[in-house]
Amino acid sequence: MITISDLKKSDNFFLLAGPCVIEGEEMALRIAEHVVKLTDKLNIPYVFKGSYRKANRSRLDSFTGIGDEKALKVLQKVSRTFDVPVVTDIHSAEEAAMAAEYVDVLQIPAFLCRQTDLLVAAAQTGKIVNIKKGQFLSPGAMRFAADKVVEAGNDQVMLTERGTTFGYQDLSLIHI
């Protein structure tokens, strides 16, 4: 199991990237292979990201995934094939334990970053918990989300900046 310490060994920089949602094994393996070649060449630690299910679609008939267990097994295969950690989003407390059986990092989507039950369930798996900052929050307010995970017994917390929304759909990001 990877730890926050493992990721910190990379001088505080690593790449977390992959498809928005797992659409199939071949696609996921092809993406991982390509990114692993690049990150190996550049000596950048890599974490493969892919949602096993996208619960936050605009339309009811939008594609949400290939099935939970099938997609989670694809993520596990990516990890084993390329020896990289994997991360996936979870959207409810009930998903935490199931997803934790297959992945190294549980990611909390930005719009769910204040959901106490979800944060506590993710924390209780013992996995790293990556909380994406809600665009409606100040960076300082994310401390409360992180504190919930730590207070639930898990100090392996990452925070991901997602920008801040001003007005209606006017998203500002920090450019690095």
Q: Which residues are covered by each model-predicted region?
A:
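Conserved, mostly hydrophobic/aromatic
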Residues: G18, F48, A99, I131
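Alpha-helix-loop-beta-strand connector modules within alpha/beta enzyme cores
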Residues: T64-P85, A122, G126
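Glycine-rich, proline-tolerant flexible connector loops at the mouths of alpha/beta enzymes
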Residues: P19-M27, V47-D68
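Catalytic alpha/beta core domains of metabolic enzymes, predominantly
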Residues: G126, N130-I174
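N-terminal amphipathic alpha-helix/helix-capping segment at the start of soluble metabolic enzymes
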Residues: M1-L15
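Conserved small/polar residues in nucleotide/adenosyl-binding loops
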Residues: F48, I174-I176
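Short, well-ordered coil/turn segments that N-cap beta-strands
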Residues: S10-F14, L42-Y46, F82-V86, Y102-D104, ...
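Catalytic beta/alpha-barrel core
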Residues: G67, V84-S92, D104-Q115, I128-P139, ...
